[in-house]
Amino acid sequence: MLLFKFNFTTAFLFTILAFAQARSHSSSSSSTSKSSASHHSSINSTSATSVYDFSSLTTPIVPTNGVAQEPTLYESSRGLSCPGYQARNISEYSYGVLAILELAGDACYAYGTDYPYLLLNVSYDTEERVHISISDLNQTQFQLSNRRDVWDAPLFYRSSNFSGNLQYNFSFNTDPFEFWITRIADDQVLFDTRGNPLIFEDQYIELTTNMVEDYNVYGLSGSQQSFRLGNNLTKTFWATGYSDSPEANMYGSHPFYMEQRYIPIGTTNTYTSASHGVLMLSSNGMEVLLRSTYIKYRMIGGIIDLFVYSGSTVSPKYTIQQYVQSIGTPTMQPYWSLGFQMSRWGYKTLSDLINMRSYLNASNIPTEGFWNDIDYMSEFRTFTVNSTAFPPNQTLDFFRSLDESHQHYVPVLDPAIYAANPNKSADRTYYPYYSGFEDNIFIKNPNGSAYVGMAWPGFVVYPDFTNPAVLQYWKQGILNLSTAFGSNYSYDLPFSGLCLDMNEPTSFCIGSCGSDLLKLNPVHPPFSLPGDVDNKVYSYPEDFNATNTTEYKSVSRASQSQYKATATSEKSHETPSSESLINGKPEFSINYPPYALDTDTETHDLAQFGVSPNATMHGNTLRYNLFNTYGYSESKISFEALNSIQPNIRPFLLSRSTFVGSGRYAAHWLGDNKSQWSDMVSSISSILTFNLLGIPMVGADVCGYNGNTDEELCARWMALGAFLPFYRNHNSLGSIPQEPFRWASVAEASRSAIEIRYSLLPYWYTLMHTASVDGTPMVRPLFFEFPKQISLASVDKQFMIGTALLISPALEPNTTYIQGIIPGDNDTIWYDWYNHSVINHDYDENITMSAPLGYVNIAVRGGNIIPLQQPGYTTYESRNNPYSLLIAMDNNGFASGSLYIDDGISMQTNSSLSVKLNSNSNTITCVVSGTMVSSPSLANITILGLSNPPNTILFNGQQLSDYQYSDQTLSLTNLLDLTVDGAFSKNWTVTWS
């Protein structure tokens, strides 16, 4: 939730939220179903006395802009005179290299004080991974690798199966010290610092690697971004609750990239390919400069903790497996999380949820989960429930009804804890604040007092998730939230998961702004909020049909008038001076380091939209050194707390802020996107990227979060979302309602897409299990499956689900056709999902595909066997329905596939099934291993690409009579009686002649 670009120089802003209710929207969209609009118009109506109202609160004068900084990125001269280092006292071993690095000349004081001596420690961790650590000799710089209590991963431990058969060479020169890493298999240089002096200062570290021409790099993400990164781009890693620019720093930090290289074979216009990976492990602020001939790392603290993965000359998926296995494979999510989820900021009462559920059910739109934003809280305070808007008895009845229908409820949980007003008697019962002080678990100021920022409740304090005592505190908070909802069962939570929002963490002011102002609490944040009279939403998607509707005219006039009012009151920022110098050296500064990061905030102050760098964490660790890990730490603690409360139920967590390895604990959504076609397009790139980064369960707010969607965009996005891992419709308070039943065409598109998604649940779940075992992405770019086809390197508007399905969505308004590529050479066979016909295509050529509204082009790749189930209204119903198999033969008449089955919810599965399926020109074999009893039978088998009709078909030796053959498609039906004990209760074989 949050955030628009706030201009704090004006008293209040107008662009956060709040334009329409369903009734007003129904009059503005000519294509809206009248019956739908009138039937559902009451869903957002609430009693004025039952919901929290900001309007009477005081707006305190607090610092919001900070001190204006000029990003250092745009300076070019600093560091050019730095001498680099020389290697001394070198010791080479079978497992690595140790050396002392000595400054090779006078200190240059680029953006800090140079260390005269460094320690080089090169460790050959595995056959595929080398770790280069460069630290100051006295070990005074912060090292994340020394804080295993905060962040731990397999990459810190040498593999017990290490054979010593290295797939790489580490080479170096001594004067100046420079190193390069080469993959032995093809002699490709993977990382190369030659010709680039190392700079290592107390607040500035610079390391540069040379790059090949027109390199293909992917990763380096914080949230939304393009897929293939350009070579004139800077990525800033500084977790913040706000960003308004593509590629800018945002919620998280993942300083890992994968490079895919194409090596031409003679003059034949064909290529081999190879990939490798690079991780610069750091929780400090960082910029990565991608330029035409190099990639440059600039860090404002810590050390160099560089991991290079030799990757693969076969497929990039092996490179990603190496990386993800080293940081920790993603957690296995519960089966229900693959269902469609419905959410918004604006379900203010229990009645809103009940009505919304009823309308979805009446519209026959399968819905798995129902989510609340902060509306359910009492005065937006964490671990509380507004008992007027959500009466405990009725709320528990609602939860029981969900449970009986095998549906789920997920509330949002913000980390910021309301700072109780000492003069308000009602605040004295707010346990999360007082018990947190008793447990001493809040982030502190340098003087030891509590750091008091600002969030939705007013002035707030922040739990320190690195404090060992915070686990019990957080666990108790979750239990108390359960009780506040009316539950009498401490260890049987009424909610199925938690949505971890605002966990960078976000603050609406600079510094500990509320330390001396708690007697004013609760206070109004220093900008206009949902429900304020001047807070309307006027934006619509690109190419929105601006007809003569009253809505659009009034929106346009109001938007222009408010823009003019804001523009005239805009004030220029204070002109910053250069950093302070002491004896010619940059002054050490935590809040305003000499190297100013290019953050996407108004002043580039590091504390804007976050907790200040000089705040203190457990063990007197500066937040400056752990800045990018807060969301990771909250996910870890929340996972452990839920696991402690319900030990055998998989925790489901959805986190906005993520760091390296967050996938071990949480899924991720891309944050506060916009209801724009461009945001729908970029969501594909971001989801593909996070699958490379070890967080496969990821999705965007379908139909958009900020701004108003429209019918066409929402129909297209609901259809697209069904083919991405995490599928949730969510938008902001003040924007028009966008539940899929609001428009007839959106409802139809949703039903069609969800029907396909739910039929594919066995396939999706198997992909999820594979990801949790070895890190293989669930959704993949095309070049992952076709790594030698160079034209696919930049394709990011089509994608693969696993190895078998190619998804080609419509991503532009006012179109019924799309252009797309069908990958692979002319021997690669693709079948149309809907009619099973062979798709004709030429190598490396786009084809035109029909794409009417509500339709997504799906191609099935020959060589795959896809397990399916008859879709139901919920994932529970679906997984208890009969199975079927879709077998798509390749050019040689072969196909294979797999299926993983467990109970879908247990943390430790006592029994499961692994099924291997293979087919050739006249036989299908099913080999089952495992002890789980799975009762659904097998209903039918469809075989595509069978050249000749069969005369006789046998299922485990028993002749079949129910089959049809047409256009190279064989359909075997009425198999239920042959598999009454379960489709995969035992091995079986189908043969034909």
From Swiss-Prot:
One annotated GO biological process: oligosaccharide catabolic process
This protein's name: Uncharacterized family 31 glucosidase C30D11.01c
UniProt cross-references to PANTHER family, sorted A to Z: ALPHA-GLUCOSIDASE, P-TYPE DOMAIN-CONTAINING PROTEIN
Keyword presence, Glycoprotein: yes
Signal sequence, start to end: 1-24
PROSITE patterns: GLYCOSYL_HYDROL_F31_2 (PS00707)
UniProt GO MF annotations: alpha-glucosidase activity; carbohydrate binding; hydrolase activity, hydrolyzing O-glycosyl compounds
Family membership noted in the UniProt record: Belongs to the glycosyl hydrolase 31 family.
Entry EC number(s): 3.2.1.-
Active site: 504, 672
EC class name: hydrolase
Record flagged with keyword RNA-binding: no
Entry GO terms, CC: cell surface; extracellular region
Taxonomic superkingdom: Eukaryota
UniProt keyword list: Glycoprotein, Glycosidase, Hydrolase, Signal
Source species of the chain: Schizosaccharomyces pombe (strain 972 / ATCC 24843) (Fission yeast)
One Pfam family of this chain: Glyco_hydro_31_3rd
Glycosylation site list: 7, 44, 89, 121, 138, 161, 169, 232, 361, 386, 393, 423, 447, 480, 488, 545, 548, 614, 673, 814, 826, 835, 846, 910, 940, 987
